[in-house]
């Protein structure tokens, strides 16, 4: 019987999902992206060679693994084809391994222009988007005026839908934001070029997943961003435009929820956030700087510096609840190696009230003071450790405390960026 695992970020994204997905795809017939777009940045390091992926699933470097992009993903054709060409330049047959849902909404130049214009207009109140058109593309999907991959292969239908779409968005660009309009003919010609390139890679993703399961092959569902950026459950409005939680693996691919057997939450040993929004455990001192330097906390997609802070067990408990987490993968443990004392947030003091669960709304969270417990650090190297018993005693105690506070077992520990720098305590595919 096929066993299917969902991998999600359990914080504000950037938890190290790409490495873990690459590691686990050794056991799978296919890996599938189910939400987000090329605002994701998944970094893989294999035998010292780094590969950064934005749209293509992180299993693409594994021979014999099919990589699927589900209907929940918003697709920027230019970004996808650029990524394909980069992989082919490294000898990876990306076109052979990749299949794309015809129902994927397209990100077009008008979406990028709108995204950037809106963010600029917000000034100091900006959300911190990547400016890649993700939000406007999802808006068009929900409003039922979006253009999908399937539309590329019907010129007259494409031209009619594109004309209507640009009439709408150009009005806003010109008369509200005072920006230049997007040229219809230029976008149409680009889309027709994309059609020729994409056609061989388009397939019914739900049917492919069913065929893999019927053949007894395991599946891996790769989430992007993180739980606390979910459009419904995150720190709204400082969130992304898609559902980033495990439930989206079903709606974003066409698989039934009963076929999702194990949910692995990827979790840094500390906390980071990029862009705007509340961050109770943020450290704006030398420890925060140390975490950023040792963790190389710069976005793989935007290059922006990430904000760093202590581990937040309150937020993680909510992520565990929303996702029904089966296990945790703790990443970047080695970043904490030099610290004498480690702090874990176990509650928020908001005025006279102590919250031990995540308060509703970003506004309330911004006014909370974190309540901590302190644990001794280990001040010795964990970099590259591959066996649990080889970790320092205090490192093991720290991980066990996280298990206790969150109520979810630690299944995997990452001790470095390379695929092999990993401790596997519980293989999700053997536990599913």
UniProtKB/Swiss-Prot annotation:
GO terms for cellular component: cytoplasm. Homodimer. Plays an important role in the de novo pathway of purine nucleotide biosynthesis. Catalyzes the first committed step in the biosynthesis of AMP from IMP. The keyword Amino-acid biosynthesis does not apply. Its EC number is 6.3.4.4. The active site is at 14 (proton acceptor), 42 (proton donor). GO terms for biological process: 'de novo' AMP biosynthetic process; IMP metabolic process. Keywords: Cytoplasm, GTP-binding, Ligase, Magnesium, Metal-binding, Nucleotide-binding, Purine biosynthesis. It is found in: Cytoplasm. The keyword Transport does not apply. Mg(2+) binds at residues 14, 41. It comes from Alkalilimnicola ehrlichii (strain ATCC BAA-1101 / DSM 17681 / MLHE-1). IMP binds at residues 14-17, 39-42, 130, 144, 225, 240, 304. This is Adenylosuccinate synthetase. The gene is purA. Substrate binds at residues 300-306. CDD domains: AdSS (cd03108). It comes from the Bacteria. One of its GO terms (molecular function) is adenylosuccinate synthase activity.
């Amino acid at each position: 019987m096929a066993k299917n695992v969902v991998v999600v970020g359990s914080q504000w994204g950037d938890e190290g999902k790409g490495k873990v997905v690459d590691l686990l795809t050794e056991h799978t017939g296919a890996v599938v992206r189910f939400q987000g777009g090329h605002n994701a940045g998944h970094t893989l390091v294999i035998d010292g060679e780094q590969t950064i992926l934005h749209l293509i699933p992180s299993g693409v470097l594994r021979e014999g693994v099919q990589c699927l992009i589900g209907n929940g993903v918003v697709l920027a054709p230019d970004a996808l084809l650029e990524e394909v060409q980069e992989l082919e330049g490294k000898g990876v047959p990306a076109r052979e391994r990749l299949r794309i849902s015809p129902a994927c909404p397209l990100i077009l130049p008008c979406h990028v222009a709108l995204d950037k214009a809106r963010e600029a207009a917000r000034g100091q109140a900006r959300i911190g988007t990547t400016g890649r058109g993700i939000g406007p593309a999802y808006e068009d999907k929900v409003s039922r005026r979006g253009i999908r991959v399937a539309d590329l292969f019907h010129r007259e239908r494409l031209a009619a839908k594109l004309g209507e779409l640009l009439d709408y968005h150009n009005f806003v660009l010109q008369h509200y934001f005072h920006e230049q309009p997007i040229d219809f003919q230029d976008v149409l010609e680009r889309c027709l070029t994309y059609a020729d390139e994409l056609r061989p890679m388009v397939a019914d993703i739900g049917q492919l997943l069913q065929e893999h399961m019927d053949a007894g092959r395991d599946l891996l569902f790769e989430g992007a961003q993180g739980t606390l950026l979910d459009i419904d459950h995150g720190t709204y409005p400082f969130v992304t435009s898609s559902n980033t939680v495990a439930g989206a693996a079903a709606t974003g691919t066409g698989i039934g929820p009963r076929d999702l057997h194990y949910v692995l939450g990827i979790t840094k040993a500390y906390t980071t956030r990029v862009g705007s929004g509340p961050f109770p455990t943020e450290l704006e001192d030398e420890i925060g700087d140390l975490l950023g330097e040792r963790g190389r906390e710069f976005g793989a997609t935007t290059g922006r510096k990430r904000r760093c802070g202590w581990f937040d067990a309150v937020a993680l408990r909510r992520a565990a609840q929303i996702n029904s987490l089966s296990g945790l993968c703790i990443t970047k443990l080695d970043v904490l190696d030099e610290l004498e004392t480690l702090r874990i947030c176990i509650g928020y003091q908001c005025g006279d009230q102590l919250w031990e669960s995540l308060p509703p709304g970003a506004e309330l969270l911004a006014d909370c003071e974190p309540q901590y417990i302190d644990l001794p650090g280990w001040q010795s190297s964990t970099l590259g450790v591959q066996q649990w018993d080889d970790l320092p005693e205090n490192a093991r105690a720290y991980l066990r405390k996280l298990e206790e506070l969150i109520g979810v077992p630690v299944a995997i520990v990452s001790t470095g960026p390379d695929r092999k720098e990993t401790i596997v305590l519980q293989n999700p595919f053997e536990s599913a």
